[in-house]
From Swiss-Prot:
Subunit structure: Homodimer.
Name of this chain's protein: tRNA pseudouridine synthase A
Keyword tRNA processing recorded: yes
UniProt-annotated catalytic positions: 53
GO MF annotation list: RNA binding; tRNA pseudouridine(38-40) synthase activity
């Protein structure tokens, strides 16, 4: 039987979603697979909609796995949460998946949120869940810059990590919204799929634009140059959240 689950996790202590050979540390995938084994004594592979990097969090990661069991869905969910209680991972919902469902390849859209605290004083309670930017940011300039990246089939070669393995750097970004709420700024980014570190490079570029390093229109030149060196910095991972996956 194939199961589909929505997962929340704090990415601080993890090396990322995916198991990685030769890399010290624990992945979210490994934690969930170990919990399933403790429940069922079955070795399964858990697939995710988004392979988040080390330090990146999830509010609505979607996963699937195949498991032979007669247990009811709620029993599986509660048992996994019992085994995951010390790992900062929580199964929010779990159900039998439709035939052919794949957490990654069936996804129609992924929604990310990046959280910035924009004030002089660094955060204390949420320091590993937001990016502290002390220099005042102009959100209107950030939004104008973002507008140049939204639309059909733009080449984001300047906005992907050097180690990105995707064959094409062309992506359609459906939404980038920059919203200020007091000292907090939220950057919402939505697309069917993203390049490696694309969202974090977009956010880093918008932040540099927001404190006046370059005008919003410079984003057009960044896109045209198709060179990672042309874009801004890569925002740190701890401000990024995978919020929702649509199917």
């Amino acid at each position: 039987m194939r199961y589909r689950a929505v997962v929340e996790y704090d990415g601080t202590a993890f090396i990322g979603w995916q198991r990685q050979k030769g890399v010290a540390g624990r992945s979210v995938q490994e934690s969930i697979e170990d919990a399933i084994y403790r429940l069922s004594q079955q070795c399964v592979t858990v697939f995710a909609a988004g392979r988040t990097d080390a330090g990146v969090h999830a509010l609505g990661q979607v996963v699937h796995f195949d498991l032979n069991t007669s247990l009811q869905d709620y029993v599986i969910k509660n048992a996994l949460n019992h085994y995951l209680r010390s790992d900062m991972v929580s199964i929010l919902s779990l159900e039998e998946a439709a035939e052919g469902f794949h957490a990654r390849f069936s996804a129609k859209k992924r929604h990310y949120m990046y959280k910035i605290v924009n004030r002089d004083a660094p955060p204390c309670l949420d320091r590993l869940r937001m990016w502290h930017v002390p220099k005042q940011l102009n959100v209107s300039d950030m939004q104008e810059a973002a507008s140049h990246m939204v639309g059909e089939k733009k080449d984001f070669a300047s906005f992907r990590a050097k180690e990105c393995q995707s064959k094409s750097s062309v992506r359609t970004v459906d939404r980038i919204d920059c919203v200020r709420e007091g000292n907090n700024i939220f950057v919402h980014v939505s697309a069917k799929s993203f390049l490696h570190k694309q969202v974090r490079i977009i956010v880093g570029t918008l932040v540099q634009c927001g404190h006046g390093a370059f005008p919003p229109s410079y984003v057009l030149e960044i896109l045209e140059r198709k060179n990672r060196a042309a874009a801004g910095i890569t925002a740190p991972p701890h401000g990024l959240y995978l919020v929702l996956v649509e199917y």
